[in-house]
Amino acid sequence: MNTRLVGSEMCIRDSVYSPKITNWQLSYDGRRKEPVNFPVKFPLLLAQGAEGIAVGLSTKILPHNFVELIDASIKCLKGRKFQLYPDFPTSGVVDVTNYNDGKRGGRIKVRAKINQLNKNTLIITQIPYTTTSSSLIDSILKANEKGKIKIKKIEDNTASDVEILIHLPNGVSPDKTIDGLFAFTNCEVSISPLGCIIENNKPLFTGVSDMLIKSTMNTKELLKKELENKLKELNQLWHSSTLEKIFIEKRIYRLIEDKDSWELVLEAIKDGLKPYLELLKQVVTHDDVIKLTEIRIKRISKYDIDKADKKIIEIENQIEETNYNL
């Protein structure tokens, strides 16, 4: 199945990874490049959760609260203990007593939030994870048909927020109905997590704590790669800026005015730079020399030495800061 990133997905793409340290490949139609994978710098798998099944293999990783994941990552970096529990976008009340760190054999219970609006009306404002307002209502109607609970009618006023009204017949106890809803409908569901991820192209059964540790270490490695890439770019910028300053300030460009061939021009520039090579941090390459020949006369005449010095100092400060961060 081939897909294309557009709109908000492109925005997310630009915010969760660095294109300069990402491996790219051509898209299915060859018109653009797309990432081989997303080197995300936060525990996206644990934040969103994941579920899948294959021959003899399955996984069910529950979603977790993003802020709690970040706090746990900080504790991980500080060598402190942490504990993670699932948190669901549909809200609801969860019992994590037997969560077992999201490993095989664990189990949690999630309940809808049900309140008594008046003596004949119940209101559901939060539903369990894995259910929808429609599937929840269907389970309530089936329980009513089987005589497990007694209801008069249901109103689904769900919009951006869940609001399901359950109208009860006269004389029916709201408390007993709530107990029946938890016992016989999807107002209470049991979920069995199964932590399974792919590591080095092999399935690995593990808990969410270990997943977070791996994610945190991966984030450190990605940040290190970004800083190393930034340092490389800054060093190259410093080299180019310093080389340009020497070329113009020492009037090396005048050495090429009477040269009749391209080879002689390049040789003259190399000879002119020799007395100043000790000021540079890296070797002057053939490409460096060619770039100097591309500087226009107008740019040379308007060259500001003080401005160039400030630019070089600014680059040096950025290099120092990047080295410190590394």
Give the ranges of each region predicted by the language model.
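Active-site-adjacent "gating/activation" loops or surface patches in catalytic cores
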Residues: 31-38
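Single conserved hydrophobic/aromatic residue that forms the stacking wall/gate
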Residues: 1-12
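C-terminal interaction appendages of subunits in large macromolecular complexes
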Residues: 15, 19-20, 24, 38, ...
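Histidine-acidic residue clusters that define the catalytic metal-binding segment
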Residues: 25-31
